[in-house]
Swiss-Prot record:
Presence of keyword Ligase: yes
UniProt keyword terms in alphabetical order: ATP-binding, Cytoplasm, Ligase, Nucleotide-binding, RNA-binding, tRNA processing, tRNA-binding
Family in the record: Belongs to the TmcAL family.
Protein's recorded name: tRNA(Met) cytidine acetate ligase
Domain of life: Bacteria
Subcellular localization, as worded in the UniProt entry: Cytoplasm
GO molecular function terms attached to this record: ATP binding; ligase activity, forming carbon-nitrogen bonds; tRNA binding
Single GO biological process annotation from the record: tRNA modification
EC number: 6.3.4.-
Summary of the function given for this chain in its UniProt record: Catalyzes the formation of N(4)-acetylcytidine (ac(4)C) at the wobble position of elongator tRNA(Met), using acetate and ATP as substrates. First activates an acetate ion to form acetyladenylate (Ac-AMP) and then transfers the acetyl group to tRNA to form ac(4)C34.
Any one annotated GO CC term: cytoplasm
Gene: tmcAL
The keyword RNA-binding is assigned to this record: yes
Catalytic activity: cytidine(34) in elongator tRNA(Met) + acetate + ATP = N(4)-acetylcytidine(34) in elongator tRNA(Met) + AMP + diphosphate
Gene source species: Staphylococcus aureus (strain NCTC 8325 / PS 47)
Length: 379
């Protein structure tokens, strides 16, 4: 079976995602579409608006198979996120990865991926790091502000291409142009596509503008409980106050004395966004700081972070997904394709299980990795 992989967060699933899946399948003639999706915490450095089980159900309206991306990938830089996602795709024997971009010029993106690899090895790069500049700013400066780097999706696409070249040369890549909505649009316009940011804003504001930008047949899933950063803050504040400076120093992505900034600013902060502003320096982007804070909340240490895939968690599948999974289990009997977590296989998913428990403690939800079987759809 020919497969196409989509590296996603679906926070939440919307018409743009449906378009992306359908176009990916059409352009690759794939028999099966595999969504590799972030779990309960996402790359923006925040909890997903809906839990991973609800979002997997949403995705199954169009995708055939939904696989959970390791939690530490979702709370890492773009390059590590991409590297682990590509390794999951390779573990799933994906033929092609299809990603969204603003310019839809795969040749240019591949050239940029090659150029960035060279830049990262240069003395100029090392010098600018010492000057305290953020990674995105350094790359932008050394590539003379290439216009393709103005788009978050292009930047992430370049990270996928770098990861494929390094770890999975057997995987092809295609780029699909995003339709209408821009990544950071904060308001829903009057057309069928909208950004995830604007949809989350609409849902949290409890207006009904999101109705026309998500698939009609799954709209009932969008009225389930959701979670926000303000709900997270009291738990995060407790964690930072309770932890010693040395303990904070040992959290994944906490470097260069940032543990001291956490301790010295936590008492003044009135809410999550205020805290992030107090912590901001020219070296770190807001998103990097938010991911760091989620690592503090989840108590993720560098030793928890894997660079290899030893098992994957299947969140949802339909008939085609089941057929493909059966094919994989026959072709790769030594690999661990887990549909239901139990005591014998839970050690593969320690971070994901913990993230779900903490997400539930804050949101008051009850779905765990142990009591929620793989979501199945029969057609």
């Amino acid at each position: 079976m020919k497969s196409v992989g989509l590296i996603t967060e679906y926070n939440p699933f919307h018409n743009g995602h449906q378009y992306h899946i359908n176009q990916s399948k059409k352009l690759t003639n794939a028999d099966v579409t595999i969504a590799i999706m972030s779990g309960n915490f996402v790359m923006r450095g925040e909890p997903a608006i809906y839990n991973k089980f609800t979002r997997a159900k949403m995705a199954l309206s169009t995708a055939d198979l939904v696989i959970e991306l390791p939690a530490t990938a979702s709370l890492s830089s773009g390059d590590h996120f991409a590297e682990l996602a590509v390794k999951v795709a390779d573990y799933m024997s994906v033929d092609t990865i299809a990603f969204g971009s603003e310019n839809n010029d795969i040749k240019t993106l591949k050239q940029l991926a090659h150029s960035i690899n060279e830049i990262e090895q240069s003395e100029s790069f090392s010098q600018k790091v010492k000057e305290g500049k953020s990674y995105p700013r350094i790359i932008s400066e050394l590539l003379e502000h290439h216009e393709a780097l103005a788009s978050p999706n292009n930047i992430l696409g370049i990270s996928y291409l770098k990861a494929i070249a390094k770890n999975a040369k057997n995987i092809n890549a295609i780029s699909i142009k995003r339709e209408n909505a821009q990544h950071h649009d904060s308001l829903i316009q009057h057309h069928q596509f909208a950004s995830g940011t604007s949809i989350r804003t609409s849902i949290i504001s409890q207006d009904d503008h999101w109705h026309h930008v998500v698939p009609k047949d799954i709209q009932h899933l969008y009225v389930t409980p959701h979670i926000t950063l303000n709900q997270i803050f009291p738990y995060l504040k407790y964690q930072i106050i309770a932890m010693t400076t040395d303990s904070l120093k040992n959290i994944y992505t906490v470097t260069e004395g940032f543990e001291n900034r956490l301790k010295s600013n936590i008492y003044e902060a009135t809410d999550f966004h205020h805290f992030v502003k107090l912590l901001k320096t020219k070296r770190y982007t807001y998103t990097h700081i938010q991911r760091l804070l989620m690592n503090v909340l989840l108590n993720i240490k560098p030793t928890d972070v894997t660079s290899n895939i030893h098992a994957v968690k299947v969140l949802a599948m339909n008939d085609r997904g089941r057929q493909y999974l059966k094919h994989l289990k026959t072709a790769f009997p030594e690999r661990q394709y887990i549909t239901n977590i139990n005591k014998s296989n839970a050690h593969y998913f320690t971070n994901e299980i913990k993230a779900t428990h903490i997400y539930n403690a804050i949101s008051g939800q009850q779905q765990t990795d142990f009591n929620t079987p793989v979501i199945q759809q029969y057609r």
